[in-house]
Amino acid sequence: MRRKINSFFAILLCFSVAFCATGCMSHGENNGTGGSQSYTSGIGFSESESDTAKPIDKATDKSTSTNKSTSKSTNKSTDKSTDKSTDKSTEETETPLTLKVASYNIFHAEKAGYDLSKIAKNITDNGIDIVGFQEVDHFTRRNGNVNQMAKLASLAGYPGTGRWFYPAIDHDGGQYGLGIMSRYPILKHDYIKLSSGTAEQRILAHAEIDVNGTIVHFFVTHLSYDGEGGGSSRAKQFNEIATKLSGYDNFILTGDFNTRDLTEYKVISNSAMVNAKGAVTYPDGNSPLDNIVYSTKAWTFGEPTIVTKSYSDHYMIFAQGTYIKK
């Protein structure tokens, strides 16, 4: 009988313990709202960014670490792949450098009635990037003491850092010579005197131009004509020009060569000419006097365009070149 009673009390005791445990847990869920918030915050689901960033336990930390490692690996791999793909795509789609360059003998604007706006319009209408001028006046009386290069640059909307005048001779109270005008800044400029004998002094002008990080060596000249013993003088002048250009792989030469013999320029090594085969630039019907010569190591050029309404005794010639030097 005592055993049965003991067994009964043992069963009753177990039942009471179980009931108490269940009641306590239930009571905590219903009334312990503060404890619930603490739990939620602990696993990183609160709106606080700092709380969210914290791992809750080792297991979670390991998992997070693994995810981070996987993410880094994936990102690194993806970044490399993307970089390679981007680099390759950039190489394939990179736009080559192109320039429209012109040679323009403006006859000191006399044919334009000394109205430089007409000459400037020719340049802007054709989208010229760099132009080499011949027969430019600089503060001469006949031109009303005007700085023609500064005036042309202003009318055409070219920057003040992109134009320069190069004096060949003193004339009419001022100077007369060559000019270079560029949409891009001229970093350096110089010129050399060419052998001219007793005739009018001739020069070769040079500008070092920064075209979006690529240095272009741009030259302009105006050589002797036959009436002043130009044949023998020009041969010397071309040789002197060739010597000067030999120091540059990346050059463009513009000018009025005053000769119909288009082979004379060939003393300039690694070069080619735009304006071959009868492109008339002087209005007597057969005189291709104005030319563009370029380094074949750095450039290719398309066919030239001749602008017949040039307000001068010469037509403006221009062509587009593509930079190929790596």
Tell me the role of every PLM-derived stretch.
Residues M1-A10:
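Bacterial N-terminal signal peptides that target proteins for export
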Residues A10-A18:
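Hydrophobic helical h-region of N-terminal Sec-dependent signal peptides
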Residues C20-G23:
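C-terminal motif of bacterial Sec signal peptides marking the signal peptidase cleavage site
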Residues M25-F45, K54, S89-N126, S154, ...:
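Active-site regions of metal-assisted phosphoester/phosphodiester hydrolases
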Residues S36, S41, S48-S50, S63-S65, ...:
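Serine residues within intrinsically disordered or low-complexity segments
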Residues K54-T90:
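Long, intrinsically disordered low-complexity tandem-repeat segments
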Residues I106-A109, F133-G144:
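Active-site neighborhood of divalent metal-dependent phosphoester/pyrophosphate hydrolases
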Residues I123, G127-V136:
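Proline-aspartate-enriched helix->loop->beta-strand connector
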